[in-house]
Design a protein with these regions (language model features):
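N-terminal maturation segment of proteins
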Residues: 22-342
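Bacterial N-terminal signal peptides
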Residues: 6-17
Length: 342
């Protein structure tokens, strides 16, 4: 939800000064200033995303995932939503009104999401600090010495970030709020891959391999040596702490069920997710029934197409025929392009 809002705002505020100059009235200017305020806040709230979009000044930092920061963030988004809803929409042009609707919808969704403990779902096999730290370092700019100094600063701050993640994971575990155990199966090996015995093989060091010509060989060697020192003295112990916690406490006691509804207040949480991802007011059961009816309708239409074609055989035989008969395959790139165009 946060990423969707920042993408919307990126499109809106990327030409902020120009947009402000061409705003039709004071209300549209007020709206643009609110958008810019939200954007600036989001960039400081998530420094890793700020790095991703090229926002300056955040490259040495990590997000604050503490409970206090989560609560403060929710309150801030309530403030933004209240400001946004005070805008007189009757005075907005069509484009500005659409911008208002998109941002309002996303902010409202963020505030609604704060009723559920997503902040505890910080790690699984597809994401978490065991992958995210190295990934963030790899996408940082490498244009000059300051860029590499930012990487060193971010490396220095990473151990505290890992410890903060562990604290939140521990709190979530105590409350019975974890990802399904099966989604954590590969996490220990992912951690080990991040901290191999030979630090030169660590993905944490991979961003220190492509230096610009403006950095001398001596400076390059000094930067690499400092990176290795930080990684071995600070990050290796922090990741080992995470590894022990995952293997001895977290994974053995994580949720065995894959159903979100089995979590505390899970049914309401699941229904919220349904609304969030389908952007409809349909219930989970209504969506399930709709899916069944659509499958039945589509299958009936497919059976009719098979019957009308004159094919004699079962449905599975017909699909096998479609997959294997040469008449359904192009024999050249030109035929493929011609078939696409025609």
């Amino acid at each position: 939800m946060f990423k969707r809002l920042t993408i919307v705002l990126l499109l809106v505020v990327s030409g902020f000064s120009t947009a402000l100059a061409f705003a039709n009235n004071a209300e549209e200017k007020k709206l643009l200033r609110i958008f810019d305020e939200i954007w600036q806040y989001d960039m400081t709230r998530d420094p890793t995303y700020a790095t991703y979009v090229g926002y300056p000044g955040q490259n040495g930092l990590w997000p604050d995932v503490s409970q206090a920061a989560v609560a403060a963030d929710t309150e801030k988004r309530r403030e933004f939503l209240a400001k946004l809803r005070k805008i007189n929409r009757k005075r907005l042009g069509d484009d500005s009104l659409l911008d208002w609707q998109l941002v309002e919808k996303n902010l409202a969704g963020q505030v609604d999401s704060s009723e559920f403990p997503d902040q505890y779902i910080l790690i699984h096999q597809r994401g978490g600090v065991q992958q995210g730290i190295a990934e963030t370092l790899s996408m940082m700019p490498q244009r000059n010495r300051q860029d590499f100094q930012d990487q060193l600063t971010r490396l220095t701050n990473a151990s505290a970030y890992i410890e903060q993640n562990i604290a939140m994971l521990r709190e979530g575990l105590a409350k019975g709020i974890t990802p399904p155990q099966i989604t954590l199966r590969d996490v220990p090996q992912q951690i080990r891959n991040t901290i191999p015995e030979d630090v030169n093989q660590s993905p944490l060091l991979s961003s220190f391999t492509n230096f610009p010509d403006s950095i001398s060989d001596d400076e390059e060697a000094a930067l690499i040596a400092e990176a290795k020192r930080i990684i071995t003295e600070q990050l290796y112990p922090a990741f080992n702490q995470l590894l022990v916690f995952m293997e001895t406490d977290y994974i053995p006691n994580a949720a065995s069920s894959i159903a979100l509804s089995d979590m505390p207040d899970g049914t309401n949480w699941y229904n919220h997710r349904v609304k969030q991802f389908t952007t409809s007011s349909l219930t989970a059961n209504e969506i399930h029934e709709l899916g069944l009816s659509e499958v039945k309708r589509i299958r009936a239409e497919m059976d009719k197409v098979i019957a009308d074609s004159g094919f004699e055989g079962s449905f599975s035989e017909f699909t096998h025929f479609l997959r294997t008969d040469k008449q359904f395959y192009m024999t050249s790139a030109e035929d493929l392009l011609r078939g696409y165009r025609d």
